[in-house]
Amino acid sequence: MKAITLLFLVGFIGEFQVFSSASSPINCQWGSYAPWSECNGCTKTQTRRRSIAVYGQYGGHSCVGSAFETQPCQPTRGCPTEDGCGERFRCFSGQCISKSLVCNGDSDCEEDGADEDRCEDAESRPACDKDKPPPNIELTGRGYNALTGQFRNQVLNTKSFGGQCRKVYSGDGRDFYRLSGNILSYTFQVKINNDFNNEFYNSTWAYVKETSTEHSSSSKGRFLFFSSSSSSHGYSSNTNILTKKKSYQLLVLQNTVEVAQFINNNPEFLQLAESFWKELSYLPSLYDYSAYRRLIDQYGTHYLQSGSLGGEYKVIFHMDSEKVKKFDFHSEDKRKCASSHFQFLFTSSKQKCTTMEEVLKSVSENEGNLLRGVPFVRGGHSGFLAGLSYLDLNNPAGNKRRYSQWAGSVPDLPEVIKQKLTPLYELVKEVPCASVKKLYLKRAIEEYLDEFDPCHCRPCHNGGMATVQGSQCQCYCKPKTSGVACEQGVLLGDQAGGVDGGWNCWSSWGPCVQGKKTRSRQCNNPSPSAGGKSCIGETSETRQCEDEELEHLRLLEPHCFPLSLVPTKFCSSPPALKDGFVQDEGATFPVGKNIMYTCKEGYSLVGDPVARCGEDLQWLVGNMHCQKIACVLPALMDGIQSHPHKPFYTIGEKVTISCSGGRSLEGPSTFLCSSSLKWSPEVKDVQCVQREAPLTPKVPKCQPWEKLQNSRCVCKMPYECGSSLGVCARDERSKRILPLTVCKMHVLQCQGRNYTVAGRESCTLPASAEKACGVCPLWEKCDAEGSECVCRAASECEEAGFSVCVEVNGREQTMTECEAGVLRCRGLSISVTGIRPCVAEAA
């Protein structure tokens, strides 16, 4: 059984505020459209695509509209699906299948059944006594987008048996099913886990970092993306549930139900779905990211190598960190909770995790004892999903019944879970120019993954993690921080300190030199400062050029490189643009290729951004330059810090300069970005000097009704009083008599209010209520069993409190609050006649 790890915020020492001001919202901005693709000979259309120039962040708007545009055109080449199949059989759709599948009694042409249309002798056909495939077998043939965690359109033909008669026994169903030719192994084995896996995360940052998947593009540049379960019933990943107004801890409960397990065949033996095969046929044999990206949008980045059919249940409960902090969790409480596996939520038991139940009730922010969470459910009947979004802390049996109803519906409506994936480009086959298209699809998937690299995002404050989701950058905050940019709150403990560095995006690939090319990146998003950690990884990367592989394919498949369309000459790398760079540069620059320039942050491009590789192998570049639109700080000496630390500052923004290490700043500390895009005052000759240690000021000794603030004693507030003896007090201004405490009277008199002690019979003091151990007043202590507060003896007073004048049996005497409280606790009738010692009042 999986042990529970409770990640609670305890034992932190020190706090450090890294950022304090919110970042302005950044709206998403589209870039310019790329050139139109080659005209598709099958659909007689061409497409073009625009990429995102600026990702939305810090609460800014998403990009509106489609990234693609399509228009009709006149093709210069025919449709590949109209070509012949050689020695193979051609379906009406144009797809080619083995002749051994013709007239075998099965419709192996997925859409039209052409392979069985002209079979005269039906009795001589091979026969299988079972034609019924396993339930929901079509789920095993879908594509999968590894970035979004969503299943896409069908890529495998799960209806074809491949001319084989392989059967599998269902077990509980007492029936036999015939396996698809694409299935290597299929097992009916129901697995229901009665123990719920559960984890605590001390922040949304910790949850996303734990559940994110680390991906590598071909460039070996690693980055994280958030991949969550998606459901056909609408419970999909929605980051808006991770509210930005507070810091939250997360409790995650999850479980799975398995119905069957499957393994698909090796790629070379898989039969493709006709719709997917057609799209592969339509792909151009010249690299055009727009065309290949459209295929990725429709069919995903991977297909299923193996997995299980079943259901997946996960619910996330958000707990206000400030409320959780009020509860003291002992090691014994944690041990009980860990051993219970949270079964107390689903099964009635005498041994309950009491402390945990109290925490859940306190932080639920919901009515009664209903703990509402955010469910992520895959599989099962949609009618049961609403009941999975909450838990009734007083009705474990009801919780179990609702979960069991959903789990019981999973065998009838399963989804794929626990999937293992293979890249989609491994399925590029049985189409013209398959080797070339396979290479280009691999390149397009790498380019697609790079679009979602967090390097496109601006830094989150306080060490938050940025992820790309659609056209937005989302910040996930560390413990005790919150806000759209994680700008609110403080970092705690060993996380307090400087700003850790983050990688910027890779540069474009350099030219091929001896069959290799190189690119680089910088650790400046943000740059490490104030002792923060530097980036982990390499600053440069080298890999083999694709040119040699393309030249080899040109020899094997020369028809895929028509001379009229494929240039044999290439331009060198495009000229550099000061304060700018080439957008989506690519690896090679054939004659006729257009590229687009853009400017780095803080600059705007003026002029024509498009350049073209000419016939003379020279770049045709128009007049353009990057115009400064913001202020940039000059390089500062070591030990000088800027706040806020940003790559550039817009007009009207201020930056504050400070020194670290106990040194003092010479010169102005605040600078304004003026309308002339210069700093006012000018940032020059700023330096830090060692300052003499200041004399430690004498700390004044405050009265009990005072507190130390800014090196001087000031009056406390009444609510800051702790346990104190109750008295009746007269407000000499309004003549009202009201119940107060000795401490509160001292505080009010300190603030200039005139209160005097009145007789005890003049007001009703609050009745002494039974209190649990831990909150006993001065004159009480915990009993031997440690369950409730009982009266102390006068000699047992540990904290005396104020000295007051008390009348006992008609005689006034000076006592401490604790001594007087002991007498009152033991039933003696006493009356407080003054809030100071009797002798002092007499004087």
From Swiss-Prot:
Keyword set, alphabetical order: Complement alternate pathway, Complement pathway, Cytolysis, Disulfide bond, EGF-like domain, Glycoprotein, Immunity, Innate immunity, Membrane, Membrane attack complex, Repeat, Secreted, Signal, Sushi, Target cell membrane, Target membrane
Q: What controls how active this protein is?
A: Membrane attack complex (MAC) assembly is inhibited by CD59, thereby protecting self-cells from damage during complement activation. MAC assembly is also inhibited by clusterin (CLU) chaperones that inhibit polymerization of C9.
Location (main, coarse):
secreted
Start-end of Basic and acidic residues biased regions: 121-133
Q: Which residues form the LDL-receptor class A domain?
A: 84-120
Q: Name one GO cellular component term.
A: extracellular space
Renumbered to this chain, region (Factor I module (FIM) 2) spans 771-843
Alphabetical list of Pfam families matching this protein: C7_FIM2_N, Kazal_3, Kazal_C7, Ldl_recept_a, MACPF, Sushi, TSP_1
State the compartments where it is located.
Answer: Secreted; Target cell membrane
Please list which residues make up the signal peptide: 1-23
CCP 1 as annotated region, ranges: 545-615
Q: Which residues are glycosylated?
A: W36, N202, W503, W506, W509, T696, N754
PANTHER family in the record: COMPLEMENT COMPONENT C6, COMPLEMENT COMPONENT C7
Q: Which family does it belong to?
A: Belongs to the complement C6/C7/C8/C9 family.
Could you tell me what this protein is called?
A: Complement component C7
